């Protein structure tokens, strides 16, 4: 495996923001608590190559096999662990400029997975603002994930921050055999303090139960 992280007994740390290593970086900074897990993809928009993935244990879909007529002995479907809703998605602007580390002039970048405490930390500076982002999935409450943002001015100037957070059910699996989207939205809503979305896996012709 290509080494892009520093050697340390308990932390997986990198200061490298190389687009060619982005997927490896995401894989190596994944989080999980035996109930759900997620890759170390960025919360904010990233227009470069990335592989977003959030998964819930036991939730899968029978993806119809795609083979030619000459193939014999293949199953009718392959059980696929499908991407769950993206609940970490955020669109962030500094003084009207969209935060996108694939395009921005980024300094002081660091991503570090604390293996002892199960916490992912990321720091970077763009547009005169330093971002410190902490993410975890709870070991005590299996359905709980937490993301904390700490923003500070790096240039001594005042900045206007726009933060659009969302729960995204329009997710895909890159390796789906027929480019299907496996979730359908049943209900959604929000108020001043919270938002929710209820989804269910789409119907399938194989008698596999649908997950909600």
Regions found by a protein language model. Name each.
Residues 2-212:
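Beta-sandwich/jelly-roll carbohydrate-recognition scaffolds of carbohydrate-active enzymes
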């Amino acid at each position: 495996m290509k080494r892009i992280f520093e050697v340390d007994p308990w932390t997986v740390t990198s200061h490298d923001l190389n687009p060619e290593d982005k997927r490896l970086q995401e894989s190596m900074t994944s989080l999980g608590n035996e109930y759900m897990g997620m890759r170390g993809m960025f919360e904010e928009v990233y227009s470069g190559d990335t592989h977003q993935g959030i998964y819930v244990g036991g939730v899968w879909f029978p993806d119809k096999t795609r083979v030619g007529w000459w193939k014999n002995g293949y199953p009718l479907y392959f059980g696929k662990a499908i991407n769950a809703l993206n609940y970490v998605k955020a669109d962030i602007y500094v003084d009207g400029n969209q935060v996108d580390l694939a395009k921005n002039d980024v300094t002081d970048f660091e991503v570090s997975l604390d293996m002892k405490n199960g916490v992912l930390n990321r720091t970077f500076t763009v547009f005169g603002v330093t971002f410190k982002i902490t993410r975890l999935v709870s070991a005590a409450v299996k359905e709980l994930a937490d993301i904390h943002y700490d923003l500070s001015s790096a240039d001594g100037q005042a900045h206007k921050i726009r933060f659009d957070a969302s729960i995204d059910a329009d997710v895909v699996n890159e390796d789906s055999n027929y480019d299907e989207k496996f979730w359908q939205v049943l209900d959604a809503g929000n108020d001043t303090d919270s938002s929710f979305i209820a989804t269910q896996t789409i119907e399938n012709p194989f008698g596999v139960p649908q997950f909600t």
